[in-house]
A protein has these predicted regions:
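Fe(II)/2-oxoglutarate
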Residues: 3-5, 175, 180-190, 206-383
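Conserved DEDDh/DEDDy metal-dependent 3′-5′ exonuclease domain
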Residues: 17-19
């Protein structure tokens, strides 16, 4: 396996690692659920030289049979020849893609590095643009990419110390396809369809797509991150239920950190340290990027006002003293028990779908309308 303790700190490109056509087929199969992906708010669109503009995305029923169809469709929808589309949480839409990463990467990662992983967060970038709208940047976690093609892309990478000595620690300005990459001079790596790329955390990088192409990505989630996420979500959901606490405002990250650190009845005092504050910061920006940013797509509101779980999944419930443990989509929530909370999850298990109106009606048996609406918003962001 190409990942081991000796080379974990280095950029790795393994040529022709995978048969890209097989994953490309899985990707197009996933895109048959394009409407569902849009409704889930797990899609971001960048055009007009890299500015985010989800208003461009319309809900047209379309079958994507090949690359040309998809590129033609998106160019027409966005009214732009250069654009970037980012899709998050692909593991919810394609079992084949998810199984590929589990079989080929997760087990090998744990075996070679001795690091237990909860799993991977899967995503995709596709489009045609000069430099990625995120500019030259470093990531908080290791990044794994599999390039599907059909055309090559170009990857620019800088060791952190070298880049920061030239440009400082700040990433380049976001929302711009024209990031100047000439100052920290480096030759691009040509990445062909089927190539596997490993970018260690902290390594600055940028991607160029002069021709249309699709890339799948995975962010490893260490088991420790799972424990942090559980506490984070438990605290927020419990606060919403008991105090009508509203997390879904655009608040400065320092204010969010301060508020979370004050929730001592859920999060242990021992976690109040620099590492924990860094984790809060990372989680905040992850949520802001992929979860709670308002998606401005013009969609049917009735479709947004419902929660769905896959037909083959069940929400597991377990009572523990005054709490209800809820295992949903890989996240364990510890919620203060109430009959209405238990009723709504049992309803969702039976019907696989619950509308906002039905859920509010159930929750309002024991809480205010304001609190019930916030519970709906939070639970929906994790389904």
């Amino acid at each position: 396996m190409f990942l081991n303790k000796e080379n974990i700190s280095k950029l790795i490109i393994s040529n022709k690692f995978v048969k890209a056509k097989e994953l490309e087929y899985a990707f197009y199969t996933m895109l048959k659920q394009f409407d569902n992906i849009i409704h889930s708010k797990k899609i971001r669109v960048y055009k007009d030289n890299g500015v985010r503009d989800d208003l461009s995305l319309q809900l047209n029923k379309t079958s994507f049979l090949n690359v040309e169809d998809l590129h033609k469709f998106l160019s027409k929808e966005f009214k732009a020849t250069d654009y970037c589309v980012a899709i998050s949480e692909i593991e919810k839409y394609s079992h084949k893609i998810s199984d590929f990463f589990i079989s080929n990467i997760i087990h090998e990662w744990s075996k070679n590095l001795g690091e237990q992983l909860l799993g991977f967060e899967l995503y995709s970038f596709l489009g045609k643009y000069k430099i990625t709208p995120f500019g030259i940047h470093d990531d908080k976690e290791h990044t794994i990419l599999v390039h599907l093609g059909p055309n090559p892309m170009y990857l620019y990478c800088w060791e952190s110390e070298f880049y920061e000595s030239i440009a400082g620690k700040e990433s380049t300005v976001l929302g711009n396809f024209n990031t100047d990459i000439s100052k920290p001079g480096v030759s691009p790596h040509k990445v062909e369809p089927g190539d596997f790329i490993f970018i260690p955390k902290g390594m600055y990088h940028a991607i160029e797509r002069s021709e249309f192409s699709i890339t799948l990505g995975a962010i490893p989630i260490p088991l420790t991150a799972r424990k942090f996420s559980e506490r984070f979500i438990q605290a927020k959901l419990s606060e919403i239920i008991t105090n009508s606490y509203n997390f879904f405002n655009y608040k400065p990250v320092d204010q969010i950190k301060s508020e979370i650190l004050n929730i001592t009845h859920i999060i242990e005092d021992g976690l109040k340290n620099i590492d924990f504050e860094n984790e809060i910061t990372n989680e905040y920006f992850r949520l802001k990027s992929n979860g709670f940013l308002v998606n401005r797509c013009l969609v049917n509101q009735s479709v947004l006002d419902e929660i769905k779980i896959s037909d083959y999944k069940n929400i597991q419930l377990k009572k523990e003293l005054a709490y209800l443990l809820v295992f949903i989509n890989g996240i364990e929530l510890k919620i203060r028990h109430s009959n209405s909370i238990e009723e709504l999850f049992n309803y969702l298990n039976s019907n696989k779908t619950i509308t906002k109106d039905i859920m509010i009606k159930i929750l309002c048996k024991e809480m205010s309308l304001e609190a019930a609406e916030k519970v709906f918003t939070l639970i929906k962001s994790y389904t």
